[in-house]
Amino acid sequence: MNAFDKIIGYDKIKTELMQISDMIHRPDAYAALGARMPKGLLLDGEPGLGKTLMAMALMEDSGLPCFTVRRCRSEEGFLKTLEETFGKAADAAPSMILLDDMDKFSSDEFSTAEFTAVQGCMDKVWDKPVFVIATVNDADTLPDSLLRCGRFDRQIIVHRPDTEDAEEIIRHYLERQVAAPDIAISDLAMLLVHSSCAELESALNEAAVYAAYDRSSTISAAHFIRAVLTTVHHVSPDISDADKEDQEASARHEAGHIAVMELLAPGSVAFATLCSKRPRDCSGFILRNSRLDMETNVMTLLAGKSACELHYGKVAIGCGDDLSKAAAQIRRRVETLGSNGILGVNVSGRYDGSDIGKMERETILRAELERYLFKTKELLAANRDLVQELADALLKKQTLLHSDIQSICGRYRAVPAT
């Protein structure tokens, strides 16, 4: 098994790591073309994405003597360990050093002694074949002098897995599990869209725990859904103690969100669910798998309120968060692009904090919000049957997977608002 095979997905990053390894194994071929081996590699990304695994795969494939430094001592003891490790690496050169969680080396955000020490150690081995790998959760917290070329020539941003990577990671873990045959990996990837690698692994393991406790021979969709909701989103799938009226209103609200997003950007809803955040509560949310343009995003945010008001004939409550988010998006749009012409656009480069300026922006914002609310209600009114079926399906199943939503929406031809 190749060392890089331990990295599931992330093909572009693997290619970059393999190129560095190739330079280590074939230095003469690169030197013949005047290429110099980079002095360092920085892997930057939030926790739980497998940065350390990637670094260790490169270290293993290189076949070089490798040394690792982690912050687990007092400042004085740590600085001594750092210097000793670089000294050992220099004596064993060609070699590699892994500075794991380097942004955690400093215990005080105002202290740079540890980072200065790293710079000094790297400069001391400048003329020796010592390759330094560092993993960080946020490179913005590091001094610019440490990140300059000549120290960390290569910087790789490690993002959360995209849908393809998530499917590959899920497929890898399911090789060790017994999933029900009707579970589609694509649906699981949509359930876990935007999740970190650690969250993927934790949710899949939790699903197996639930299945075993239920004395089930396979892991069902319900087990996976429960695991994702509790492990990743920290909500309960149990809404049985909530009032029926609350359940119906929540289903209607979420159905509005789904309908508008699918009508304006087909295939964008990853999954939708009804859940509970507190005892006797019923709420819900939908997750999207792609970016939306501003207008689609605003109308989707207003769709829950609009769907409930169309159905119940009264002002919907509990939609303040959606309204605030929609207003924030419209405000950014108005202040940078304008609404009609350049009305409201900041063309001077200076913020107008006067009462007149604030009143003008507020007037434009309210007018735009009302316009989008009316437009959203028109679209939902023209597609009432779709909203009704989505609401009924949510009440029945509580969670609609991506395939469920596509199956329902595929039976309807979108009716444009008049």
Indicate where each model-derived feature is located.
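Walker A/P-loop NTP-binding motif of AAA+ ATPase domains
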Residues: 2-189
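An acidic site on a long C-lobe helix of protein kinase domains
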Residues: 9-13, 114, 196-200, 248-251, ...
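Residue-level signature of catalytic and energy-coupling elements of molecular machines
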Residues: 17, 42, 59, 118, ...
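Terminal C-lobe "cap" of eukaryotic-type protein kinase domains
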Residues: 227-231
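Short pre-active-site segment immediately N-terminal to the catalytic Zn-binding motif
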Residues: 237-250
